[in-house]
Each structure stands twice: as structure tokens, then as C-alpha cells.
Amino acid sequence: MQSVLYPWHRQVLRCSWSRLCLLKRYLFTMKLQSPEFQSLFTEGLKSLTELFAKENHELRIAGGAVRDLLNGVKPQDVDFATTATPTQMKEMFQSAGIRMINNKGEKHGTITARLHEENFEVTTLRIDVTTDGRHAEVEFTTDWQKDAERRDLTINSMFLGFDGTLFDYFNGYADLKNKKVRFVGHAKQRIQEDYLRILRYFRFYGRIVDRPGDHDHETLEAIAENAKGLAGISGERIWVELKKILTGDHVNHLIHLIYDLGVAPHIGLPANANLEEFNKVSKNVEGFSPKPMTLLASLFKVQDDVTKLDLRLKISKEEKNLGLFIVKNRKDLIKATDSSEPLKPYQDFVIDSREPDATARVCELLKYQGEHGLLKEMQQWSVPPFPVSGHDIRKVGISSGKEIGALLQQLREQWKKSGYRMEKDELLSYIKKT
């Protein structure tokens, strides 16, 4: 990569790729030619760029995809920005016989086109006219810098041309290289435009920063002053961000910060959280890719805390059940563990539950408890099928449904005691003895 910084207004300087550029104040530009960038050029993208160029509309890669490419990562999702209005895009795609899908984003300037079996989400440059802390009324523009100004963080405010030219108006590239997470302009203003940006700040801090603790004082002050604004944000949006915080780096530092700055009560977290347990569990799970709820459950003292979280964030049934399971069993299964067969109580739980996700839940509990050796054994263990059915018991002359059920339970207990080794004939002979 080659780079040049242009700090003065409307100066004409020679760029690093040997052509003259007329650039606005503070615009930083450089040339990117990486394998990750080149890999984006599918047949669909080539057709898209050719169409926009033919109609004299500017088109660039925008936001998070640019950040990822500069970090040497191929982005999973690529968003595009353009000077063309939604009406112009629709006319252009219709004339070219290109199908458009999902028109829900049109009022915000987004058109999704399908080319060569790929979807391309293209959004018109825009400025926020009015904001209420959750949504914005937008106005379309052709000014790239104005669009960059409305974005949340400097590292997310860059654009990339298809010749590899980076357009960076707010030192996003420098912040990315220096592992800094900063709001575009004033933190307070950006946050009040959309209070969810508080959680986005924490999320990207966990992705970008090498060592925790380096925060801008103005940013932390703005977060503390505006934390209550998160009370008006939907639980679903909060949970999306919180899950990403919990699966990122520096999670212990960030959760403590969320409590210190008064954010926690507005996002469904308990006021009397068990932060000591959280400190211990965050170390236990490090390097073992826990599910977000596995770590979050350490903050909860009672199962009712999980229920309250669900009411606020609308978590999935699977996530709620995992939280309830961990809070209920995190101590009991440890107490039940026989030192000679430490995995046995966990295996018995899976056998008794007969639920398809029981093994996965137990594995999350073992991560929580820091039982890494048992976790490896559990992951390698295949749940054995219980060899006796009600039909088998009827064959030995027992027809009462109630009696069959009781016998099946007795046989299951004998089978468990044998380490799941007793076979059908052995178990049925046990009936005859009794």
C-alpha cells in the first residue's frame, strides 16, 4: 500500500500513483491493491460497476467492508454507496433488465439488485435531516464527505473506489492502524443521533484495540450522560450488539465499563450483577468460543434474572433455556461429581434430558466451569441409545402401561450405573429377577 496525506484545502498535489488529484480539506487517500480486494471482483460486481460507470454515476465500497479490507480481511458483507438517487437506480436497473429485490430500504436510499446470482445492496449518499435517537429522516446528496460525516465511527466512515483508491475524510485509516476507536466529530452528537452507537462503540473496541483501557475521556463522558437513551432502543437491536460484545476481545473490561458508566440497567442487565463470578468465568471461557449467553449467565444470581433479560431483549428460546440451565446447574453438577468418574453426572444429565441440544448445553456449562478436560471428553462422547423399549417389556408378559413406565425407569437407572454398558438381554433378565 502507498499513501499520501493532503492536509490543506483544495491543494493540488501529485498522488502516490502518479496522477493529479483535486482533494477536499483533510482528505487522506491511498492505493489499495490486496488479494482480499481483488477477490471481490466477481462477474456480478464487474457488471454492476460497468453499469454505473456507463450512466455516469459514482459507485464506491462503503463502511465496514473498507475497514475489513484495510485490515487484510475479506469482508463477509459488502455495502455500496452511490451518487445516484433511488429513482435513478431503479430506472437504470429496469432498463438493463436487472431484477431488484427487497424494496424495504428504498425510503432510506437503499436498492438491492441481483446480478449473476449475487445480491448487491447500493445506498444513495445521504445526510440526516432529523434524528430522534433511534431513527433518522434522511435527505439525498452527492457529497461524499457529507455522507461520511453522518457515520458513527471514523473506522467505518471510509470509501473505496474500484481502482483501489481509498477516500478517508476523518482519519479513519490512521485510527485503524493505531488501534483507536473514535466517533466521527463529537461523540455526544453522534450518540444522540442513535443511542445504539454506545454499544457499537464497545463492540468495535473489542475488535480493534490491542490492549484495553485507552479511552477518550470525552467519549466516556458522552456515554455516561446519554446511557439512559438506550432505554428507548428495541431489545432486538440491543441484543444483536451485546452478543457481538460478548464474543469479542476485552469482554471483561467492557462489561465492567458498561456497569461503571450506567449503561447496564438500560439494556436488561441486572443491577446487582455478580461481577466476581463474571471475572472468574470470563477467564474460564477464554479461548473456548463460548456462546454469548454462557458468559452473560455469570452476571445472573437467580433464574429470574434470565427471565427479566428475556422480557427486555426478546432473546431466542434456545438462548433463554441455556441461561436458565446454567444458572440452575452451575453449582449442583459440580457437587454431584464423583472424583473417580467426574464426567458421569454430566453424561447422566444428557441421558435423562433426552433433548437434542442437551450435549451442547452441557458443553457450554463445562466451559463456564473451566472444566476443559471434561469438555474435551464430552465433545468426543456419543450419546448411547437406551437398548430397551416398552415393546420389549411387553414381550416378557407385562401389559400395564403404568408398570411398563416404572420398569423402564428402573432399567434406565441400572443401565446408567453400568456406565451405559448393559445390553438388552442383561436388562430384561433383571426384570425376571425382580
Curated annotation (Swiss-Prot):
The protein's Enzyme Commission number: 2.7.7.72
Keywords per UniProt: Acetylation, ATP-binding, Cytoplasm, Magnesium, Metal-binding, Mitochondrion, Nucleotide-binding, Nucleotidyltransferase, Nucleus, Phosphoprotein, RNA-binding, Transferase, Transit peptide, tRNA processing
Pfam families tied to this protein: PolyA_pol (PF01743), PolyA_pol_RNAbd (PF12627)
Residue numbers marked as site, Involved in nucleotide selection: 193
Residue positions binding Mg(2+): 77, 79
Gene Ontology MF term list: ATP binding; CCA tRNA nucleotidyltransferase activity; CCACCA tRNA nucleotidyltransferase activity; metal ion binding; protein homodimerization activity; tRNA binding
Origin superkingdom: Eukaryota
CDD domains: NT_ClassII-CCAase
Protein location: Mitochondrion; Cytoplasm; Nucleus
UniProt xrefs under InterPro entries: Bact_CCA-adding_enz_type3_sf, NT_sf, PolA_pol_head_dom, PolyA_RNA-bd
Cofactor(s) of this protein: Mg(2+)
N6-acetyllysine, modified sites: 402
Family the UniProt entry places it in: Belongs to the tRNA nucleotidyltransferase/poly(A) polymerase family.
Complex and partners: Monomer, and homodimer.
Protein name: CCA tRNA nucleotidyltransferase 1, mitochondrial
Species, as recorded: Mus musculus
